[in-house]
Amino acid sequence: MKEIVIASNNQGKINDFKVIFPDYHVIGISELIPDFDVEETGSTFEENAILKSEAAAKALNKTVIADDSGLEVFALNGEPGIYSARYAGENKSDEANIEKLLNKLGNTTDRRAQFVCVISMSGPDMETKVFKGTVSGEIADGKYGENGFGYDPIFYVPKLDKTMAQLSKEQKGQISHRRNAINLLQAFLEGDKNV
């Protein structure tokens, strides 16, 4: 079985990759380097993904995939953006992040939002490649559903009439921002150099 190393300690992200790559042995970097951590000093999802994949590839001397992803709310000028995981502060829960976002959005009628995922792939003998995927939706007025993680309970997908947290893992795996970025990665790996 082929192996994919993900430069992330976020179990939710690793589980997403496992669903999307069922024919691969997906390994989170903490299984190989328990204390691996890269300070995300970039100002964009792309910069942070590259920081992680290049640091992990150098440390392991093998090809590694990293992603940086988050939620952008149009009425909040793209917040929480690259701060999605720590929107309510360092080491705060998903619940705290959701509460802050809903409070900040208030009764705003423009609730358009998008999840963004930038995947970078780095290795010892290759130039880093970057792939970006998005999924559009709206911020719900409250939390709905029990599945997923992060902002999934408040991210409403109009064409499905459900939040991401109301979707099965398989359904989410087919439409997610991560899936869209991975589609580009897969096309590249299969030889489409126009990606």
UniProtKB/Swiss-Prot annotation:
InterPro entries: dITP/XTP_pyrophosphatase (IPR020922), ITPase-like_fam (IPR029001), RdgB/HAM1 (IPR002637). Its cofactor is Mg(2+). GO terms for cellular component: cytosol. Substrate binds at S8, N9, N10, Q11, G12, K13, S69, F149, G150, Y151, D152, K172, H177, R178. GO terms for molecular function: dITP diphosphatase activity; ITP diphosphatase activity; metal ion binding; nucleotide binding; ribonucleoside triphosphate phosphatase activity; XTP diphosphatase activity. Pyrophosphatase that catalyzes the hydrolysis of nucleoside triphosphates to their monophosphate derivatives, with a high preference for the non-canonical purine nucleotides XTP (xanthosine triphosphate), dITP (deoxyinosine triphosphate) and ITP. Seems to function as a house-cleaning enzyme that removes non-canonical purine nucleotides from the nucleotide pool, thus preventing their incorporation into DNA/RNA and avoiding chromosomal lesions. Homodimer. This is dITP/XTP pyrophosphatase. The lineage of its organism: Bacteria, Bacillati, Bacillota, Bacilli, Bacillales.
